[in-house]
Amino acid sequence: MTELEHLAERVRDAIPLTRHLAFRFAGFDGATLTLTAPLAPNHNDKGTFFAGSQAALLTLAGWACTTLLAEALVKETADIEGPVDVVAVEGNQNYRLPLNDDLTVLAIVTDDDRRRFRERLARRGKATLTVRARALNPAGDTVCEFEGLYLARLGG
């Protein structure tokens, strides 16, 4: 099982709502997390992707990105111990277009934000991270924009 598959399993076990979203963590390169989800379990009465599902998936992508970055710091640094606890502090989304198809989310952390986050988490045992995300349709058009603030704490 890959690290992303293990994280998805942890999420589904801990947050029952996520089982219904049928999401998949499709990739993480240390700066961008990719999440995908099908329309079928997430549609609304108009047959488009439900805004509530989009909000949940965007929030989840930001949480997962923060969690992966914090857990990587723990693995890389001998004198830092886990577990890591991450919570969403703030989140705002702006819906741009209706979505009649499957969804791809790109959750992105800038190099400067990632560096500051790692430094503060290592020094203080807690740190906030801003994650920006875009929900895309299959053509690559942005259907929703999101910005979230997450707090990570070491020691759970």
Feature annotation, model-predicted:
Residues 1-16:
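Extreme N-terminal tail/first-helix region
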Residues 98-100, 110-156:
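HotDog/MaoC-like acyl-thioester-processing domains
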Residues 17-49:
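Catalytic strand-loop segment that frames the active site of acyl-thioester-processing enzymes
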